[in-house]
């Protein structure tokens, strides 16, 4: 039995092979928005293909239970297809659904919730349509980008899907506008002072990631330089130039991470400027947000989410609420005024410190 026969035997007789071309129709989506086509009984996952579209697909990987394909030519388009706003959408692994109309995105997300409840929770529950933003651009209040080098210059961007190759960019259409200005300027300064990116293969260089947190309502920003070494070239100069250019910067932090894996943040932080946190507001409360503390990524939509949760919960003054995975206490403090007691549970120590401070600063003692 040759290798091809062995492969077909273990795949239940499937004759599909790598580099084969097939004509197929998309029938569904994966949980992360890849199109699913069926060929000889095997599901094939294809990026940038929508339900009911027909196209020519090249098979690029064949496994026992599924295959992966690349869309070569679209022969029949979906009426829900739209032009992606970002010119790097097809290369970058950051976004999955920019080619799908807002209505179809809403349907996709609603169905994903429905399917998850059915398959994992075994709940036969009717799911209301997801509540969508009017304008889903430039909204994210946190971004972390890897730093690399190309043609002798530093680059920042996002990884291609399933790879360690950086798609260099200066503007991301879902990150806040300040981050789109701050990251390229920081990269320019790091190159000016002679810093080099960390190389995962040789373990040379220093700069791993640049991270920004932004307070949507306060216009406060945190900049974090994640480094392989404790040293950082011309720290004082970097801080001086950054604060001069961006008065919104409330704190600048160096995070030391000597690990060789994919964990982004290290354990040790050095505050180069400011108090080590920023503040933002949510539903009438002010919150302290530290580097490792979780805060909802979409500050406008989270208000809609929390208000809807409060409405559905039908809380009573005698209720006792447990806020599991409470983070910095945003849900806890939003609910506290409606109930007798709220308990927040969280594994990240820095987040609990922020939560206690947030309860105190907002006068919440229950």
Regions found by a protein language model. Name each.
Residues 12-88:
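Terminal RNA-binding accessory module
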Residues 72-84, 90-197, 217, 232:
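Extended interfacial segments that mediate partner engagement and assembly in macromolecular machines
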Residues 35-40, 157-160, 224-226, 355:
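Short, acidic/hydrophobic/Gly-rich beta-strand patch recurrent on exposed beta strands
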Residues 56-58, 144, 322:
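Hydrophobic beta-strand signal
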Residues 52, 175, 298:
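Short, conserved phosphate/pyrophosphate- and ester-handling motifs at nucleotide-, phospho-/glycolipid
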Residues 3-9, 15-23, 31, 230-366:
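Rossmann-like S-adenosyl-L-methionine
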Residues 212, 218-228, 286-290:
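Short, aliphatic-rich beta-strand segments
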């Amino acid at each position: 039995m040759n290798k091809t026969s062995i492969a077909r035997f273990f795949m239940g007789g499937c004759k599909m092979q790598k580099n084969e071309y097939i004509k197929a129709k998309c029938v569904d989506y994966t949980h992360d928005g890849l199109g699913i086509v069926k060929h000889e009984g095997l599901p094939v996952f294809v990026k940038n293909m929508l339900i009911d579209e027909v196209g020519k697909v090249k098979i690029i990987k064949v496994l026992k239970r599924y295959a992966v394909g690349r869309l070569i030519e679209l022969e029949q388009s979906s009426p829900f297809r739209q032009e992606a706003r970002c010119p790097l959408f097809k290369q970058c692994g950051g976004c999955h659904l920019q080619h799908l109309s807002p209505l179809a995105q809403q349907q996709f997300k609603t169905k994903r919730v429905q399917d998850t409840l059915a398959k994992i929770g075994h709940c036969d529950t009717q799911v209301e349509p997801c509540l969508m933003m009017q304008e889903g651009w430039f909204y994210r209040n946190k971004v972390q980008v890897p730093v690399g080098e190309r043609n002798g210059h530093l680059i920042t961007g996002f990884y291609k899907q399933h790879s360690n190759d950086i798609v260099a960019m200066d503007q991301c259409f879902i990150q806040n506008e300040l981050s789109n200005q701050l990251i390229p300027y920081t990269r320019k300064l790091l190159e000016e002072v002679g810093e080099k990116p960390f190389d995962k293969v040789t373990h040379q260089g220093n700069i791993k990631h640049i991270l920004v947190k932004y307070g949507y309502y306060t216009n406060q920003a945190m900049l974090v330089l994640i480094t392989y070494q404790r040293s950082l070239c011309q720290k004082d100069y970097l801080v001086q130039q950054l604060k001069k250019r961006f008065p919104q910067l409330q704190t600048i932090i160096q995070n030391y991470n000597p690990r060789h894996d994919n964990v982004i943040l290290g354990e040790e932080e050095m505050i180069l400027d400011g108090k080590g946190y920023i503040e933002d507001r949510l539903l009438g409360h002010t919150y302290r947000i530290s580097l490792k503390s979780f805060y909802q990524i979409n500050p406008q939509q989270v208000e809609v989410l929390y208000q809807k949760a409060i409405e559905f919960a039908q809380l009573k003054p005698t209720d006792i609420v447990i806020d599991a995975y409470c983070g910095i206490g945003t849900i806890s403090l939003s609910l506290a005024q409606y109930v007798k007691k709220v308990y927040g549970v969280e594994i990240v120590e820095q987040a609990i410190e922020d939560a206690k401070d947030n309860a105190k600063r907002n006068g919440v003692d229950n």
